[in-house]
Each structure stands twice: as C-alpha cells, then as structure tokens.
C-alpha cells in the first residue's frame, strides 16, 4: 500500500476550491486541516470539505501534518513557506515561490539544510 501524506492547507480563498476538486483524483495525499488569517474563510472551507479548521500556528505545530499546501497571496508565500520549513514541514506553494530572488534562495537553503521538499506550482495544480 502506498503512503498517504497528510496535508495542511493554508489560504482558503478561491484557488483552494480548485485544489480540493482535483485532490479527489489522487490517492497519495489527503488534506486533513485548513487555516486562513480570516477564520470565517477557514471555517467555511472546513465545513464544505469536511475537514478541521485551525489557526495557522496550530496547523504548523501539528505533528500529523507532513506537507503544507501554501495557497496564500503571493506577498506572504515566503513567510508561510519559511515558517512551514522551520516547523519541519514539506512545502508545496502556488506561484510565485517568493517575490524576490533573495527570499527564494533562502527558502531553498532552509529546505536543503532540513532535508525537506520545497515545490512550486508552475500553473494551478499542475494544470488541473
């Protein structure tokens, strides 16, 4: 049996719907929790997709969550990705990875040091 990775989604805006719709076609990961700075957005997402809504910090500290799906606005991709990596989580982010080269290189350095994967969508959900 293949491993099923437990994913925490951060950023419950419009693009999150696309990921939830596409996620049912994959059997190697499961979105188990969501968070958003707007708690009402997280609660709505959680209710719709029958998962748990938590704060960003709770999600990052949850030992069951292995991968963070970063769907936040571009200006905060770097901050969320960095916090995720520093909390021992693999990260898959919507584009762009960071809004400048310096921050992008820093994320790569952290991911290599901690032996974590850092991925970035070339287009929404691999074109899904």
Residue ranges with predicted function:
Residues 1-49:
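N-terminal Rossmann-like dinucleotide-binding module
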Residues 12, 70, 96, 121-122:
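Glycine- and other small-residue-rich loops at beta-strand/loop junctions that grip anionic moieties
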Residues 15, 19, 52, 77, ...:
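Conserved donor sugar-nucleotide recognition element shared by glycan-biosynthetic enzymes
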Residues 26, 62-63, 127:
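Acidic-histidine catalytic/liganding microenvironments
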Residues 26-28, 87, 112-116:
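Short helix-capping segments at alpha-helix termini
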Residues 31, 53, 91, 117-118:
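Hydrophobic beta-strand scaffold residues
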Residues 51-110:
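Beta-loop-alpha module in the N-terminal Rossmann-like domain of NAD(P)-dependent dehydrogenases
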Residues 98-128:
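A contiguous active-site-proximal alpha/beta segment in oxidoreductase catalytic domains
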């Amino acid at each position: 049996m293949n491993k099923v990775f437990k994913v925490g989604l951060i950023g419950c805006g419009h693009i999150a719907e696309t990921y939830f719709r596409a996620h049912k076609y994959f059997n190697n990961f499961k979105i188990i929790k969501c968070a958003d700075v707007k708690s009402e957005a997280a609660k709505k997402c959680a209710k719709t997709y029958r998962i748990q809504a938590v704060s960003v910090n709770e999600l990052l500290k949850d030992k069951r969550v292995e991968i963070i799906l970063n769907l936040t606005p571009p200006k905060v991709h770097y901050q969320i990705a960095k916090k995720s990596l520093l909390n021992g989580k693999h990260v898959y982010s919507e584009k762009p990875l960071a809004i400048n080269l310096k921050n992008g290189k820093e994320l790569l350095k952290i991911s290599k040091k901690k032996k974590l994967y850092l991925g970035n969508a070339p287009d929404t959900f691999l074109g899904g």
